[in-house]
């Protein structure tokens, strides 16, 4: 049952990521250009996913919610491989400032937001 829930959740997460990525490419390009050509949609997706995952862990819900939201939706929503591919592209284009900023904001920002989500959930 959890296997099926995770699969359904992953489909939902992937569709959300697709929609947000396309929306972000049209409407958030100015943000990325202002900050060394950062891939803003991927950064937004991964940081919000980290926050939500921390929150889900913090509310101590049942295993079905973990399967559908934590593993499924957020597994399909967030993207580690795209982020790293974008980091390589920033490096190859000699955009070292963008590379460092994107790496730090993705890895460190994601870790911080997991903790923020977790501790906010504990308050509720």
Curated annotation (Swiss-Prot):
Regulation: Na(+) is not transported, but it plays an essential structural role and its presence is essential for fluoride channel function.
GO cellular component terms listed in the entry, alphabetical order: plasma membrane
Binding site for Na(+): 75, 78
Topological type in the membrane: Multi-pass membrane protein
Catalytic activity reported: fluoride(in) = fluoride(out)
Keywords in alphabetical order: Cell membrane, Ion channel, Ion transport, Membrane, Metal-binding, Sodium, Transmembrane, Transmembrane helix, Transport
GO MF term (any one): fluoride channel activity
Subcellular location(s) per record: Cell membrane
Record function comment: Fluoride-specific ion channel. Important for reducing fluoride concentration in the cell, thus reducing its toxicity.
Family membership: Belongs to the fluoride channel Fluc/FEX (TC 1.A.43) family.
Protein name, UniProt field: Fluoride-specific ion channel FluC 2
Organism: Lactobacillus acidophilus (strain ATCC 700396 / NCK56 / N2 / NCFM)
